[in-house]
Amino acid sequence: MKIAVTGKGGVGKSTIVGMLARALSDEGWRVMAIDADPDANLASAIGVPAERLSALLPISKMTGLARERTGASETTGTHFILNPRVDDIPEQFCVDHAGIKLLLMGTVNHAGSGCVCPEHALVRTLLRHILTKRKECVLIDMEAGIEHFGRGTIEAVDLLVIVIEPGSRSLQTAAQIEGLARDLGIKTICHIANKLASPVDVGFILDRADQFDLLGSIPFDSAIQAADQAGLSCYDLSPACRDKAHALMAALLERVGPTQGVS
């Protein structure tokens, strides 16, 4: 089961991926969580202690590894391997916590839309390998878009979850992401409404329910905010968050069905 989570910046993607990863792990799933957001907040959302991550770099920042695997060098210029070996990277660089394998993937910024560099080749090949070859349940915390995916990879995504909040800009971003995702061939797309702080917020979402397929919602919870401020996982601090995580997990499994990844 391969699930990508995206949405406008600041809507709470990392928190939701962390909650789902912990719930799935507690239910016996073998889970790999990939942080492909440049802000890289997924570790604390899962509950990984900060001191365990201080020496780690995202794969996208490992220039030496990218050059080693692609054969790139200052003398080769733009000539390097576009499909490098990556099958051993998860075992080398994943951090294990609460039964979850966390991989800091990161992103690669380009000056031009057609730019391909060794780091980009490594990250894209690694993501394709994980989505098409690995047997775990994979959760990907993404930036606001699906730029990581190409047409050779996109069909491996079982479900795209777009996180929204009660605001017009959030819904505009969600609509843009959904349009691109459908153009690329993702068939199953749903939404989670986050940060619903009042009946007005709930009404805002329900009044527009015909615009999206709502998987579930998360009310505003001060425990989530407190966990974020402390760099901890709300799953560890709040029974209400754990209950909500398991409810979302159950709704998610109804959409895609248990396929692979159960221990």
Curated annotation (Swiss-Prot):
Pfam families the record matches: CbiA
GO molecular function: ATP binding; ATP hydrolysis activity; GTPase activity
Keyword match ATP-binding: yes
InterPro entries: CobQ/CobB/MinD/ParA_Nub-bd_dom, CooC, P-loop_NTPase, ParA/MinD_ATPase
Gene Ontology terms: cellular component: cytoplasmic side of plasma membrane; cytosol; membrane
Any one GO BP annotation for this protein: nickel incorporation into metallo-sulfur cluster
Annotated binding of ATP, by residue: 7-14
Segments crossing the lipid bilayer: none
Keyword terms of this UniProt record: ATP-binding, Nickel, Nucleotide-binding
Superkingdom in the source lineage: Bacteria
Entry keyword annotation includes Cell membrane: no
Role: Involved in the insertion of nickel into the carbon monoxide dehydrogenase (CODH).
Designated name of the protein: Carbon monoxide dehydrogenase accessory protein CooC
Gene: cooC
